[in-house]
């Protein structure tokens, strides 16, 4: 993750650190993991953890969103380059409730209001992401590579829906 930062005033150092942590580090790790798997003669799997921030606008988080978007592209590219021996899959997390995220989402009332914008009416929890990773690591997903599993409870309600009356009573 990354703390919120206004894109007009975030420092170059901050921006680079967010991109290094969320894009460069996973790429370097993937290269090292691939080498270790190939050197041992093993097929393998690399699971990247991305964020819905890489799939939509991310106010106060442009560097984080850009890095996660880049990670999604890297997943597809590495799968193409390294297949069939190495599979590469992304698991993209929606709004996940953790101790750290509470500082970003606010108090319990704010969390409840945010949850109402999600079709499943709750924020995800770390186990939701872990379960998706377990599926990706299982034999049931052996033909999956270069893809992105989005775990977001159905997404977030588009903001214009709060302003329209077109769907009242639906």
Task: Please place each PLM-identified region on the residue numbering.
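Substrate-binding pocket helix/loop in short-chain dehydrogenase/reductase
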Residues: 3-19, 110, 114
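Short C-terminal tail/terminal secondary-structure segment
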Residues: 56, 134, 145-170
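Alpha-helical segment proximal to the catalytic Tyr-Lys
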Residues: 35, 79-84, 142
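Active-site helix of classical SDR
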Residues: 30, 67, 75
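Active-site loop immediately N-terminal to the catalytic Tyr-X3-Lys motif
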Residues: 56-62, 121, 139
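C-terminal helical subdomain
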Residues: 90, 109-140, 144, 151-153
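Residue(s) in the substrate-gating loop at a strand-loop-helix junction
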Residues: 51
């Amino acid at each position: 993750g990354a703390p919120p930062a206004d894109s007009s005033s975030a420092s170059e150092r901050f921006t680079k650190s967010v991109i290094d942590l969320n894009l460069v580090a996973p790429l370097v790790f993937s290269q090292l993991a691939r080498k270790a798997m190939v050197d041992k003669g093993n097929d393998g799997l690399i699971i990247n953890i991305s964020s819905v921030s890489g799939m939509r606008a991310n106010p106060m988080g442009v560097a984080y969103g850009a890095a996660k978007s880049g990670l999604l592209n890297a997943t597809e590219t590495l799968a193409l380059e390294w297949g069939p021996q190495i599979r590469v899959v992304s698991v993209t997390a929606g709004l996940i409730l953790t101790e750290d995220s509470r500082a970003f989402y606010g108090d319990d009332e704010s969390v409840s209001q945010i949850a109402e914008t999600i079709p499943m009416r709750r924020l995800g929890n770390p186990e939701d992401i872990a379960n998706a990773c377990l599926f990706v690591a299982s034999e049931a997903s052996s033909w999956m590579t270069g893809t992105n599993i989005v775990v977001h409870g159905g997404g977030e309600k588009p903001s214009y829906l709060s302003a329209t009356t077109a769907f009242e009573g639906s």
